[in-house]
Every structure is written in C-alpha cells, then in structure tokens.
UniProtKB/Swiss-Prot annotation:
Has 3 domains, the large (RuvB-L) and small ATPase (RuvB-S) domains and the C-terminal head (RuvB-H) domain. The head domain binds DNA, while the ATPase domains jointly bind ATP, ADP or are empty depending on the state of the subunit in the translocation cycle. During a single DNA translocation step the structure of each domain remains the same, but their relative positions change. Residues 1-179 are annotated as: Large ATPase domain (RuvB-L). Gene3D superfamilies: 1.10.8.60, P-loop containing nucleotide triphosphate hydrolases, Winged helix-like DNA-binding domain superfamily/Winged helix DNA-binding domain. Belongs to the RuvB family. ATP binds at I18, R19, G60, K63, T64, T65, E126, D127, F128, R169, Y179, R216. This is Holliday junction branch migration complex subunit RuvB. Signal peptide: none annotated. It comes from Rickettsia rickettsii (strain Sheila Smith). Keywords: ATP-binding, Cytoplasm, DNA damage, DNA recombination, DNA repair, DNA-binding, Hydrolase, Nucleotide-binding. GO terms for cellular component: cytoplasm; Holliday junction resolvase complex. The gene is ruvB.
Length: 342
C-alpha cells in the first residue's frame, strides 16, 4: 500500500537534512526523551554501555531517528540493519564481529528475525559472547568469540510478534505514541526553517491536524504543499494554501484519505458496521493484512472510528457520522461493540 498518508518509510522521504541529531533537538515523546537522557548520562558516568533498548509503536514516529540520536549521544558508531536482512547466523556473526565498544547496532523490524538467528543473539546481548559452529560433521567445533560492549536497539511496529525471550532481554523498552497537533506544529516549524519554507502558524496547524499524528506524514505533506505553493505562485504557505494542497491530495479534515474511506465503507455497506474478520477485509480490498494492520487501522482506532473485537472489526457510530451514513439499528450496534470488548 503506497499513498501520501502511509506512515511507512518511502524512498522519496528525504529526511537527512532535517533529522535531529541530539535529544534536545528531537520534538515530542517528552517522557521518552527525559528517561533516555537519564539512562545515557548514567551509563556514561559509569563508563558502561547503554542497556539494550527496544522502541515499539506505529511507524513514522521516530524510532530510527532516536536510535541514531542515542548513537550520537554516547559517541559510538551507528550500524543499521533489519530483521528480514539477517537471513543466516553467519549474517549476524559478520555484523557482531565488526562492532566496536559503545557501538549502536540498530535492527529495524526486529520481530522478523528467524529463530536460529535469535538464539545466537541471546548470548551476544546478555554475555557479549558469540557462540558459532565451525566445520561440519565430526570435524565441527564450537568457537566462543568475545564481543565488545555494544548497545542493541530494536524497533518494531508489532510488539506482539516479538518472542518473549528476546523481548525480555531489552533493559529499556519504550513505546512511542502518536503526536498531538501542537507537537506536530513544532516538527513542521522546525522543518520549514531548515527547508527555507515560509510557513505561517495557521498553515502549520492545518497540516498538523491532517497528518494522522505522525511526523513522517506531516513532513511529507509539507513538501508536497510546498510544490503546490510554488506552482500556484504563492510565496507563503498559509492555511488557504495548505487547505488547497491537502484537498488536492485528497486528505480530509481529520486526516483520512481514499484508502481509509474504502476500508470504512466496505464494513459499513457490506456488514452494517461489523464485526467482520480482517482476512475478509484484506481479500475484499485486495490489500495485505499487514498493510491494513500497520497503515490504516492504528489511526482509525486512535481517533475512535474503529474497534477491534474478538469477533472482528467494528466501525463506531462516529465513523458512520463521518461517512454521513445512517447508523443501522443504532442501539443494537452500540451494545454489540461494548459486549465484544468485555
């Protein structure tokens, strides 16, 4: 699923010039920032490595950025990979044996590591040792390699898919939450200065309100609205220009786009609001289940338009109202929603 409101990283998201490098530059996630600052200062004062850290939550909220910030704050090198990229134990061994003291190893989508790789990672995280088998058959022998004290930072959008043994080995688990409008305005204002965009307060607020609580989306929308402003001969991005650009991009007043409407209308039209299983929805919309669960559903749940129940997905009365549709058997629909969540 690719669209302007996808929180997933795109090749067109050129974030390097505006990506913050240190905690004091990072906007939002205040409690996480404050706690990380304490943990980093404490580790440096003891001349120890920072405990392994796990960032989890919806995509586009700053997990990769925070990992790079930690690397900068502790003064180590930053090495980045992803769960799907580590196919074999040998792949992981090659990465680990090239680390130096205080390096940060960032593994994105860490929930997608295979079991064999995970088992090798356990002693590396706990004891900073790598146990590998050299040779085959009767000539095979185990070799133990001592690793430097490094910090592993894992990132996942699917905490429930992370195995318990791996999850328990992270000393610092942190959940990233959606941003509010004021926080997104600060993100946009900071970016507009770095990108030399004349962004007014009203223009910033209009973009922020329609960015699904996600900085990555807000920054992407800012770039596209800048394009509309340039072509329309507008030197300043105010509310009118922002509204014009967002309407052209088919982003409505609460941040929904055509994919969200397809999702909600399918449940409303075909199942009277639900419940309906996610596999049925995915098949009907010709989308992958993961794409729906990671890209569309989190925001719909966050703003109260969707509920997940044991029997399936149910859209709320607020969703019917936003779609300008009548609620079928309203009292019965409300009762079922609450009943399923008991």
């Amino acid at each position: 699923m690719t669209n302007i409101l996808s929180p997933e990283k795109s090749e067109n998201d050129q974030e390097l010039p505006i990506r913050p490098s240190y905690l004091q530059e990072f906007v939002g996630q205040q409690q996480i920032k404050e706690n990380l600052s304490v943990f980093i200062k404490a580790a440096k004062s003891r001349n120890e490595h920072l405990d392994h850290t796990l960032f989890y939550g919806p995509p586009g909220l700053g997990k990769t950025t925070l990992a790079k910030i930690i690397s900068n704050e502790i003064g180590g090198n930053f090495k980045s990979t992803s769960g799907p990229a580590i196919l074999k134990v040998a792949d992981l061994a090659a990465i680990l044996t090239n680390l130096e003291k205080n390096d940060v190893l960032f593994i994105d989508e860490i929930h997608r590591l295979n079991t064999a790789v995970e088992e090798v990672l356990y002693p590396a995280m706990e004891d900073f040792e790598l146990d590998i088998i050299i040779g085959e058959g009767s000539a095979a022998r185990s070799v133990k390699i001592t690793l430097p004290k490094f910090t592993l930072i894992g990132a996942t959008t699917r905490l429930g898919l992370l195995s318990n043994p791996l999850r328990d080995r992270f000393g610092i688990p942190m959940r990233l939450n959606f941003y509010n409008t004021e926080e997104l305005k600060k993100v946009l204002n900071r970016a507009s200065k770095l990108l030399d965009i004349d962004l007014t307060d009203s223009g910033s607020e209009e973009i922020a309100k329609r960015s699904r609580g996600t900085p990555r989306i807000a920054l992407r929308l800012l770039r596209r609205i800048r394009d509309f402003a340039a072509v329309e001969g507008k030197s300043r991005v105010d509310k009118e220009v922002s509204d014009f650009g967002l309407n052209r991009l088919e982003v409505d007043r609460i941040g929904l786009d055509s994919n969200d409407y397809r999702y909600l209308k399918f449940i409303a039209d075909n199942y009277n609001g639900g419940p309906v299983g996610i596999e049925t929805i995915a098949a009907a919309l010709s989308e992958q289940r993961d794409a729906l669960e990671e890209t569309i559903e989190p925001y719909l749940i966050q703003i109260g338009l969707l509920q997940r129940t044991p029997r399936g997905r149910v859209i709320t009365i607020a969703a019917f109202e936003h779609l300008k549709m009548s609620v079928p058997n309203q009292s019965h629909h409300q009762f079922n929603i609450f009943n399923e969540n008991e």
